[in-house]
Swiss-Prot record:
Essential cofactor(s): Mg(2+)
Superkingdom, natural source: Bacteria
Keyword vocabulary terms for this entry: Antiviral defense, Endonuclease, Hydrolase, Magnesium, Metal-binding, Nuclease
EC number: 3.1.-.-
Species classification: Bacteria, Pseudomonadati, Pseudomonadota, Betaproteobacteria, Nitrosomonadales
Protein name per its UniProtKB record: CRISPR-associated endoribonuclease Cas2 2
Subunit structure: Homodimer, forms a heterotetramer with a Cas1 homodimer.
Enzyme class: hydrolase
């Protein structure tokens, strides 16, 4: 990793700016959280990592270390008996199929979040 820096955030979860390097993978994160307070916390946390998304489904482009951190933090925020979370690895070699208003996004080789 080339470098990270803490950024100010409106919530208690600090967003991290990371200079993109080649060891990132694309994941789809979908969640169903029963409690409104936990729902807001999970949504705010994932917003710091998303490249796109809508409501309770986000696409995130992260390193294996960041993915481990995300899993650990979400495990703390969720009630594992009542809430559901899916993290699906998306194969970057597959061509995306878009329908309706959907459009593909491109990831730059250098990106500051």
């Amino acid at each position: 990793m080339l470098g990270t820096a803490n950024l100010p955030s409106r919530n208690k979860y600090k967003a991290k700016a990371t200079i993109l390097h080649m060891n990132r993978n694309l994941y789809l994160v979908a969640y169903d959280i029963c409690n409104p307070r936990r729902l807001r916390q999970v949504c705010r946390y994932l917003t710091g990592y998303k490249v796109s998304g809508q409501k309770s489904v986000f696409e995130i482009w992260v390193t294996p270390t960041e993915l481990h951190t995300i899993r650990t933090e979400l495990d703390k925020l969720m009630d594992t008996q009542a809430d559901r979370l899916h993290i699906l690895s998306l194969d970057p070699r597959m061509k995306p199929r878009c329908y309706g208003n959907a459009s593909t996004f491109t990831v730059q080789h250098f990106c500051i979040v």
